[in-house]
Amino acid sequence: LDEMSWDEVEAKRISNEEEIAEQMGWKYYLPEAAQTKEVRQQLDEIQKQSEYKDVRDIKVIDPCMGSGHILVYAFDVLMKMYENDGYSQRDAAQCILEHNLFGLDIDERAAQLAYFAVMMKARQYDRRIFSRGIQPHVYAIAESNGIDSFTRDYFANNDPKLRAALDSIINDLHDAKEYGSILTVAPADFAALY
């Protein structure tokens, strides 16, 4: 920062963060996600399935997204799939944010980093993505401490299976911020909520 002010950086319109890091003398470290091959294989498998009709139907969820590496990688893979289906990059970026990518993390800061990473990836393909009001589906998991039985009953809507699923996740996420990564959340079917 001593050698270059932020105004000078902006004036040069350096758009590549690696270039900025290099010019500022910073260490730029963003390791590749170890799961990239697995993500690619799973998406290829989905695409080959006979029931695959529309790339918008593919859902990629990272339940422990951290800073969003897997989501960013999946974004690029999905972009190629959209392009193969005839979408423009701009339309594909919007569709990916709206229909395909979902991420959760217990850490609010990690969720913010993932939001930033996914939006920067979307901006790579659509320079006006911020003005479109599209928000990625990346969220910090909230504790269930404040959820009372009336709220649960409202969402369960007299469905005993849904009530049991809600009870399970409410119990599992009690004091979630305290327990963090040692939480174990039992699988549950929440399809009735939609």
Walk through the language-model features, giving the residues of each.
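SAM-dependent methyltransferase catalytic region
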Residues: 1-194
